[in-house]
Amino acid sequence: MAKDTTGRLRVTVKSAGRLKLSSKLWLERQLNDPYVAQAKRDGLRSRAAYKLIEIDDKYHFLKPGIAVVDLGAAPGGWSQVAAKRVGAADGRGKVVAIDLLEMPEIVGVDFAQLDFLHAEAPAKLLSMIGGKVDVVLSDMAANTTGHRKTDQLRIVGLVEDAAAFACDVLKPGGTFVAKVFQSGADATLVTQLKRDFVTVKHVKPASSRKDSSERYVLAMGFRGVPTTHDADAPMATS
Ligand SMILES: C[S@@+](CC[C@H](N)C(=O)[O-])C[C@H]1O[C@@H](n2cnc3c(N)ncnc32)[C@H](O)[C@@H]1O
């Protein structure tokens, strides 16, 4: 690996000879990304952790003692941040997390490898949660097919399902944070969220790549509409 004139690490033709072009670009981006380096220094599993840190530093919804659900949690950056801020390690707060992929253990985080879109996922999640929660996070990103319309529908569909789940499990006053992509396709979602939450806004943390259409929808002050699931039992925070 060599450094360019700005001192940034570059993948040379020699070092990356056997990598595909997309892998080379990804690797170069990783090597030059200050958040990747910072995550290593801070012991965080992903650069994505800084997105949640930034959003919560501004809006303060992760409080000691609360219960959080983290959808699409692997490799675990958001779960690490949530666990620390709610005090999950010492049992004050609780974090329940799921992902399609495996995720190495995080102290205080109750994790299941699970497809959120699977018919049994809501019931499984509800049994893990054991009651209503204060915050639902979703950093899930649907796999893309390359067909723009299909991808947009899948992305929005995933967020809509996450929002519907949030409305089933949130306590009144609760918060929903979800990754969306700037496409205009989420207009219906925003309309629904405005009905169910006191404030709804889009946020783009500085750590979210500028060249990405990624942003987050932040819905706060859940109004407490009737649920379709029986999640009324008090929260267990063992
Ligand atoms: C951007 S990553 C999440 C990064 C994570 N917030 C962190 O800080 O480490 C998106 C994750 O969503 C997961 N995902 C996508 N669709 C999913 C689904 N239907 N059910 C569960 N997880 C899903 C992917 O497996 C992937 O790990």
Curated annotation (Swiss-Prot):
Residue positions binding S-adenosyl-L-methionine:
76, 78, 99, 115, 139
Task: Print the keywords alphabetically.
Answer: Cytoplasm, Methyltransferase, rRNA processing, S-adenosyl-L-methionine, Transferase
One matching Pfam family:
FtsJ
Where in the sequence is the active site?
179 (proton acceptor)
Catalysed reaction per UniProt? uridine(2552) in 23S rRNA + S-adenosyl-L-methionine = 2'-O-methyluridine(2552) in 23S rRNA + S-adenosyl-L-homocysteine + H(+)
One Gene Ontology cellular component term attached to this UniProt record is:
cytoplasm
Q: Which family does it belong to?
A: Belongs to the class I-like SAM-binding methyltransferase superfamily. RNA methyltransferase RlmE family.
Protein's name according to its UniProt entry: Ribosomal RNA large subunit methyltransferase E
